[in-house]
Amino acid sequence: MITQREISQVAHREQMSDRVIEKDYVLTWLLLGLASSPLREHLAFKGGTALKKIYFPDYRYSEDLDFTVVGTIEPDTILSIVDETLRRLATGEGFQFEMPTGRIERRTDSLTVYVSFVGPLQARLGSRDVKVDFTLNERLVFPVVDKPVFSTYGDRIDREIGSYTLEEILTEKLCAVIGRTEPRDVYDLHFLMGRSEIDFPQIPAAFAKKAKSKNVDPARLGEALGRPGLSRMWETRLVHQVKELPHLEQVLRELKRKLKEHGLLELQA
């Protein structure tokens, strides 16, 4: 485990709080730990954290880990391997971890665990935690790809993990924007729509397939971008994750133009 001094140095350089950097550091080691565990072959890393840890190391900071479970594995087996991983990281890297049974959420389509930790800032165990979410029975449109995990910290190790493609992350974000009011989804979608690495001709059909599997109406995308809750939560939800947060109005204007350009605002269910 790195020192509190290194956390503070990174926080100063990144213009973020020490707590944000500490959580990012802990998330990184949890990801590396799972990438070194028997669970690796059953995981597809996804979401905003995958954008930062797999594709774009300078991207916004995140607060949780999101995976889709592939293949056949029981939830109890997942929990057992996560617990073993936490014990191994505690012994090898000096963390303290706790996975309270009362903070394990089981649903038909997901398994969520909250992991309390003591990291370099040495806060009391139970005062800080990270969420690790496992989605079950998810339909993937694109193949899972093995990618190296980015870590900019001094004690990094080299590991790969199965991850969503950028195209898969984009189609999930399109559905997420329709299904919930969460500013980070809009921020991520705006970012992804501007990336030349993405094979955009594949996206309309992939979006339609993903939306059908999630029982989401793709025709509601434009309506979803106009929800008043976005403006109320834009700054409070994102200011601690983004160095220079753009104005929501600018983001929405550019995003709608790009969505229209790629034929994503005219899709019908």
Please provide the spans of the model-predicted regions.
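Structured mid-to-C-terminal alpha-helical surface segments
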Residues: M1-L43, K53-L65, V69-A269
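Glycine-rich beta-strand-to-loop/alpha-helix junction loops that act as flexible
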Residues: F45-T49
